[in-house]
A protein has these predicted regions:
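Divalent-cation
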Residues: 1-14, 19-121, 125, 131-134
């Protein structure tokens, strides 16, 4: 949990973008992306100024995961980018490298956010909590 929160802080240092991680045991939808979209709204991640929030969603017992990017960042990166990040995370999970897989994904998303939504200096504020959310 602490390593993941630290990765979020590091990833957000050079971007105005926001990253959150939500972990639960079971996904109550057939598709993990549907649950990620629901949680994105419930966590008010759609209320960032630049619509550049990203949610990593994991349902551990169901072995499902998804990444949901808000409109601003999704328009820049597209579905293929999110799929690539999920594939990379799954590769780490297949090696039982769960925390490293999540942290690497967070840092990669941070780089993409930095490219499209650079840090605004002192004007930039942390709009969303960096703590991992457990459902």
């Amino acid at each position: 949990k602490e390593a993941i929160a630290a990765a979020i802080i590091q990833a957000e240092k050079k971007t105005s973008g926001e990253i959150r991680v939500f972990i639960e045991n079971k996904c109550r939808f057939i598709e993990a992306t549907d649950r990620a979209a629901e949680l994105f709204q419930q966590l008010n991640m759609h209320q960032t100024a630049e619509r550049n929030g990203v949610l990593l969603y994991l349902a551990i017992a169901d072995r499902q995961l998804a990444i949901w990017g808000d409109q601003g960042i999704h328009e820049k990166l597209g579905s293929i980018y999110w799929s690539q990040q999920v594939t990379a995370m799954l590769a780490a999970f297949n090696r039982a490298d769960y925390t490293a897989g999540i942290c690497t994904c967070i840092l990669e998303i941070g780089k993409a956010l930095q490219q499209h939504f650079p840090f605004h200096g002192e004007k930039d504020q942390n709009e969303l909590d960096n703590e991992v959310v457990f459902g």
